[in-house]
Swiss-Prot record:
Protein name, per record: GTPase Obg
CC cofactor: Mg(2+)
Keyword Hydrolase: yes
Leading EC class: hydrolase
Residue numbers binding GTP: 170-177, 195-199, 217-220, 284-287, 311-313
Domain OBG-type G as annotated: residue spans: 164-330
Assembly and interaction partners: Monomer.
GO molecular function, one term: GTP binding
Family assignment from sequence similarity: Belongs to the TRAFAC class OBG-HflX-like GTPase superfamily. OBG GTPase family.
Region of interest: Disordered: 26-45
Any one GO biological process: ribosome biogenesis
E.C. numbers: 3.6.5.-
Source species of the chain: Porphyromonas gingivalis (strain ATCC BAA-308 / W83)
Domain Obg: residue ranges: 5-163
Length: 394
């Protein structure tokens, strides 16, 4: 049995904020003042659920084993107008490049792209008012208090779309992993058979004057990948966040122009807005052909596209390639349209593992509060049925 990969780029989790604490119906009790006025405090706020970007995470693996995220409830109000303690917030640490969607509708919720960026996913319920709040000139001994707001809950899908400056695009065995290993310190698996790369790999390319950029090796694309063939849709989404696409086609390919057309068509079929991204074409394995043949090939290539002839094994053309990539990355118009990532998620295209069929966690409350699911926070109150706690007359 193959070992389970540590690269997890999607996960489905259940999240719930804390509900607000109920207000207190307490009445003042002091020596020589057996029947004082109301002094019940407000309930505490329920805990919020936040998302926070963390550059120390590279995958969503840590969430695969912690998929019920629940903040704690606010505490009830107390005597002497004391407010109940707020519920403890839950912060979900995610890698930069994580997009979050509603698991039921596919609606885009938010996008975490920077280290330290924090977004509230679910808001905790407000605490209910104690009976002190309801005291008026005509009602000086209210025997009721307000319950807290109910918790919010949501099933969400998190997808990691790797943040990289340059994404390597090509058919299996195009030499993408070899190029990444030569230009960076990354050590991807390299072998002479298709689909050697089964998960994305990142590496940092050192450039002149201590400058650098991030390169991502995406698993090979085949014709029909946009329909789920090969490794299909799972890894095409990582291309969405690459600022520049480097198409890699071997020099011994029968028809380079046709292969480039197929690759471009698959990307556009997956997401039409990928056509807006800047592209560079690298003809790989050029150590297998002579310069005269290279010039003949150049005449057959698509026009209006930067083309570089390279050989990662023989380290030919690599400096020219880095110059070309940096030049394209430096252009002011190189920006990713927000709509590429922020469009709704097509839930029908997802194939979840059996373990991803989550059910909401059972809710165990510390206190018995009925009817909280249907309350109108602004109107509903709870009466104190214990008449002994209230004064007969003030």
């Amino acid at each position: 049995m193959a070992a389970e990969s540590n690269f997890v780029d999607y996960v489905k989790i259940y999240c719930r904020s804390g509900k607000g604490g109920r207000g207190s119906t307490h009445f003042r009790r002091e020596k020589y003042i057996p029947k004082g006025g109301p002094d019940g405090g407000d309930g505490g706020r329920g805990g919020h659920v936040f998302l926070r970007g963390n550059r120390n995470y590279w995958t969503l693996l840590h969430l695969r084993y912690d998929r019920h995220i629940m903040a704690t409830n606010g505490q009830s109000g107390g005597a002497k107008r004391s407010t109940g303690a707020n519920g403890e917030d839950r912060i979900i640490e995610v890698p930069c490049g994580t997009a979050v969607y509603d698991a039921d509708t596919g609606e885009f919720i938010t996008d975490i792209t920077e280290h330290g960026q924090q977004v509230m996913l679910l808001q905790g319920g407000r605490g209910g008012h104690g009976n002190t709040f309801f005291k008026t000139a005509t009602n000086q001994a209210p025997r009721y208090a307000q319950p807290g707001e109910p918790a919010q809950e949501r099933m969400v899908i998190m997808q990691l779309k790797m943040l990289a400056d340059v994404g390597l695009v090509g058919f299996p065995n195009a030499g993408k992993s070899t190029l990444l290993s030569v230009l960076t310190a990354a050590k991807p698996k390299i072998a002479n058979y298709p689909f050697t790369t089964l998960e994305p790999n990142l590496g940092i390319v050192a450039y002149r004057d201590k400058r650098s950029f991030v390169m991502a090796d995406i698993p090979g694309i085949i014709e029909g990948a946009s329909s789920g063939k090969g490794l299909g849709l799972r890894f095409l989404r990582h291309i969405e966040r690459n600022a520049l696409l480097l198409f890699m086609i071997p020099a011994d390919t029968d028809n380079i122009a046709k292969e480039y057309e197929i690759l471009s068509r698959e990307l556009v079929a997956y997401n039409e807005e990928l056509a807006q991204k800047r592209k560079v074409l690298a003809i790989t394995k050029c150590d297998l052909i002579d310069e005269e043949l290279c010039e003949m090939l150049r005449e057959e290539l698509p026009t209006g596209l930067p083309v570089v002839f390279i050989s990662a094994v023989a380290q030919q053309g690599l400096e020219e390639l880095k110059d070309t990539l940096w030049k394209e990355l430096s252009k002011e118009t190189l920006h990713e349209p927000d709509s590429i990532v922020r469009q709704a998620l097509d839930l029908t295209s997802l194939t979840w593992d059996e373990e991803d069929d989550l059910f909401p966690a059972s809710i165990e409350d510390d206190e018995d509060e009925e009817g909280l699911d249907d309350i109108d926070f602004d109107l509903e109150i709870e009466y104190d049925n214990e008449g002994d706690d209230a004064p007969d007359q003030l």
